[in-house]
Amino acid sequence: MRSVLVASLVLLASAAQAQAPAAAAAAPAQESAGAEAPDKDVPPAQDMAPPETPATPVPTCPSALPPLRSPIAFMPGELLEFDLDAMGAQAGKMTMRVQRPDNGALPVQIEAQTNTFFSKVRRVKGTAVSYLHPRTLRPSRYTEEATENEVRRTADVAFVAKDRSVKVDYVVGKRPGQYNYTYDKDGLDVAGAIYLMRQLPMKEGLPVCFDVYGIRRLWRLTGTVVKREHVSLPVGEFDAWYLTGTAVRLDKPKQKREIHVWISDDARRLPLVAVGTLDLGAVRATLTAYTRPGEKEKRAKKGKEELKW
């Protein structure tokens, strides 16, 4: 959960945030082996290593994302609440909130925090905000602030459509750094990507490909809208579109994250479930409540769930 979205990719949220539970699972093993805990003010080597140039570049996206459907399915005041599960155990909570327009942008905020159980080995609390264009839903800026076992991590990311650049200014512990990337056809962030996906013109077989920022790196997500299916959750019954794909880290293609997302097939286009798979298992975000302007709040009730994941 070093990037506030397991959810997310949100999808990617899944690709990015999923690393926190993985680290949590590894912590007990290190302790049992007698390994010394690293100085909390010294960032791990993998956090500070500059991006590499792979011998074989990741294939580019065949095409840009299709025109988005209208009208926009969400608006300021919408609040979505999720349970986060890692490797079969509840790991924490996450919220996604659409804020009021700010200087011509539509901010969307994601907050995530581990629960008491997971905090025994990995305490994580973080917030991310994506500033989206109100029509195209492309980001102009993305900010992130998280505390992980008392180590503070921040990132301020600027997206420039003119030259497709992504400038990353970050601080891990007390050490600042900067990365510069160039995205291919579409550049998103892990917080805003799920909102754009809600507006895709869903149909079976629709290809989806874009670059996404997460964990100070740029990833390329390639996927497909697989099919329309019925999903039963404690929060309600839904007909939903099922999307699946793989996120590949551009500077280190061997790092891949499998992603599965279900989005309701109705005017609300709710992100129902997002699953990211790791070597240790699956990390999942499940919608448990939603509040939308002009609608009655809906919360999960005890009941059966019908979903393959």
Language model region names:
Residues 15-36:
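Signal peptide processing junction and immediate N-terminal pro/mature segment
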Residues 5-7, 11, 43, 191, ...:
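N-terminal non-cleavable signal-anchor helices
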